[in-house]
């Protein structure tokens, strides 16, 4: 299964000078979106996954614009989870997703060739700016589970803080989610965004790929290729903009892991070169 992944698009049709680690570039969002879609099409991805924060502000027209552009390209089925910024739109987020044929993974998990694909919904926590994750679970039999979550399930707070960068925070119930997912021995691939930094982490059955933001450096578009029978996961990140002086990247452009004896093991980068070459030829 090949999944094209985008996170933290923060669409604002009327640029407001927003920033997090670096300044947002909403004026280039459409162009970069089209470039990512062209790459996903060339690679023949099976799914395009949006990891939330589609919009920056409570503006339904921003959401409609982004969903319409992604859906109109008709590259592959679309699925999404919501981010904390998307909560500002209330039910509008889910309604617009359904209108454009975009699957809400926390409402509609699905299976693909022995891979269960599911999601975590972001909900408001007991006190602002706290957020809670509601995990959808999965049904049926699977060799591997993909969990899409806007917030990382494995915290990256220490890594990001050590680099002197701002950290966007974790879910209030993050540790509970980690414990629940880690207690089940089935291998799981966690795909997340939110922190605008590219990272990877692994513990027990959990392998987490956190993708960089799309609206600011590293302007990441990502393809994750999963072979559940071989226990193989390839992550290829492509920068669609210039490298910033403050570069929030803690993982290589290409990474490879295999599920071996009940845990995820890194594999030589050389093995990825062949895979990406094969991707370009399909």
Predicted regions and their residues:
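Divalent metal-coordination and catalytic microenvironments
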Residues: 8, 48, 53, 66, ...
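Extended active-site neighborhood of metal-dependent phosphoesterases/phosphodiesterases
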Residues: 60, 64-137, 180, 223
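N-terminal active-site segment of His-dependent metallophosphoesterases
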Residues: 1-64, 141, 282
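A structural signal for the main folded, soluble domain(s) of proteins
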Residues: 28, 42-44, 147, 187, ...
